[in-house]
Structure formats: C-alpha cells, structure tokens
Amino acid sequence: MGRQVKCPYCETKLDKDSAIPYKKRYYHEKCFNTWKQESDHRKELIQYICNLYGLTSPTGMMLKQIKEFQEEYGYKLKGIELALRYFYETLDNQPREGDGIGIVPFVYDEAKRHYIRQKAIRKSAEDPKNHKREEITLVIKKGMRKKRGLVDISML
C-alpha cells in the first residue's frame, strides 16, 4: 500500500499506486477520463468559436458566457458547441460582431432534439435487422346477417 494522495478532480484520497499520474498530480481512472474529456470538449468549443468569428482566441465576454451557461443553465461544453453548430451551420445564420454566443440558451433545447433525432436516424440506418416489425393479425368474422323479409311495395 502506497502513500495516500488527493485526486484533484473529486478531492477524495486514493492510493498512489492505483492512481493515474498526470503532470505531478494523481487521479482516479474515472476522474482522469472525465477531466480529459471535459478538457478536450473545451478545446473543441474554443476552436470552433475562433473559427466562426475569425479570432485567434475568444473574447472575455465569450468565456464569461461559457462559464455562465455551465453554472446557471447546467449546459455541457459539447452541448454548447453543438447548439452553435446547429444555429450557424444547420439553420444557416450568420454570426454578428459583438453578440458573442448569447444565442445558445435560445437554441440549446431545439439543437439537442435535432441531434438526438439525427443519432436515432443514423442508428436505425446502420442496422436494418434491428427494425422491429410488428405483426398484426386480423380475424374477420363472418357476421350473422339479419335476414330481412321480403318488402311489400304496396305497403310503402
């Protein structure tokens, strides 16, 4: 049993021998993977924003908006990026100077539905054997017809 170290992500203690070392810090395997994924998503979002607005780095306002969307709305970094892609690429809107990424709260849910639908379509297209075909068996009963008597025309 090795020395106890503190995971910088979840801040719980763990054994140094079972930890994943990264830049003189020690992580749980799950925490490291989560942290690395968040880091990659942040880089992808910032890269997309820079490409979209033609910047070398995002403005302070944009970084503040990203932080606000994460803390107040609970949005994920990848979700913010996909919402921006949906608004600017799928809906063909043009970015305006000075607006930042303030459109995200207005299109986030719509973009989420769009990408979930796209994923379901891709999944069903990949494996046609997975389609569930429901068989319906209809039994047509020969109904008992009422026998009508002959109609006397003179009575009408």
Curated annotation (Swiss-Prot):
<protein>
    <recommendedName>
        <fullName>SPbeta prophage-derived uncharacterized protein YorH</fullName>
    </recommendedName>
</protein>
